[in-house]
Amino acid sequence: RGSNLTIHPLRNIKDLVYLGNMGIG
């Protein structure tokens, strides 16, 4: 997962936003 963070930072950010939206509502 760490290597993916450096290779695909945008994808990782999208994952965080997606999970954040799921948690909010």
Swiss-Prot record:
This is Pregnancy-associated glycoprotein 59g. The keyword Disulfide bond does not apply. GO terms for biological process: proteolysis. Keywords: Aspartyl protease, Glycoprotein, Hydrolase, Protease, Secreted. GO terms for cellular component: extracellular region. Its EC number is 3.4.23.-. One of its GO terms (molecular function) is aspartic-type endopeptidase activity. Disulfide bonds: none annotated. Glycans are attached at residue 4. It is found in: Secreted, Extracellular space. It is an enzyme of class 3 (hydrolase). Belongs to the peptidase A1 family. On the 2D-gel the determined pI of this protein is: 6.1, its MW determined on 1D-gel is: 59 kDa. It comes from Ovis aries (Sheep). Highly expressed in the placenta between day 60 and day 100 of gestation.
